[in-house]
Amino acid sequence: MKVATALTMLAVLLIVTKPRLASTEERTRPMSRASLDGVELEYEVRGVGEPVVLVHAGIFADWFKPLVEEQALTGRYRVVTYHRVGYAGSSRPAGPVSIADQAAHLRGLMRHLGIERAHLVGHSSGGNIALQLALEAPELAHTVVLMEPALSVPTMGQERMLSLRAAMAPVFEAYRAGDKARAVDGFMRGVSGPDYRAVIDRALPGAFDQAVRDADTFFDQELPAVQQWTLRREDAARITQPILSVMGARSPQVSPIWMERHQMVLAWFPKAEGFVLPDATHVLHVQHPRAVAEALAAFFARHPVKAP
């Protein structure tokens, strides 16, 4: 069962201002669409100012919805959100989709929008995509924010690896059995803890059902792509843009891998800064969008695209 083994190993890798209320028009208007070299991406742009591009994680297409409602971010920046291929209404290509492919889609979207340089924000596997773009096209990435990226930790021991594989095995058993809802729930519990569902249901009504519809994308395409992608220390040293590593304070209680990744980012990248969000787990920007928006805005202000 090579596929099952690969998926299990990859799961281990993944292991205040007043908020702005969106207008009725903003909440209900359809997303725009961009045709990019054979794929179509849904996207939305809010605000004006220096461009900020948000690259969402797997599972939920609308991870960033609460964040873009925050005036601290969209009141000061031109914020772009989009659905990656295989999620919601974006294209659903057959066959593998690599992290490099995803970075190419991101690059194409920026070109489509006339963005020459941006602050990139990647959550979980979205962080890997942002890093890939920074490696391939450093001129496009002014800063990179990594919100608990899905990085492989070279120092993880064999015993821990086996233990984490065993913990995730029921998730992949459920997926192979066709119980996509149980697979999605089990995976999210593994990376975010048991309280994630209440947070998601409150902030993103309907998101769990959409995640079940998108489950094939996540389990069949995204997880293998993340497993096959590697970041070496010498690669990280080439990324000289300012980096902000964001971690939820309660994430290490869910799995020690989150602290290991956070520390790895701070050690490997030449210009890395750290931010730990109190009372938060892997769903940190859904739990506390205002605090995350303020932290991002402060980081971007310290590193403006056009220095005064």
What is the meaning of each model-derived region?
Residues 64-66, 90-95, 155-157, 257:
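Conserved catalytic-core motifs of eukaryotic protein kinase domains, centered on the activation segment
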Residues 69-72, 234-280:
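Conserved loop-alpha-helix segment in the C-terminal half of the alpha/beta-hydrolase fold
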Residues 153-207, 220-227:
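Helix-rich cap/lid subdomain of alpha/beta-hydrolase
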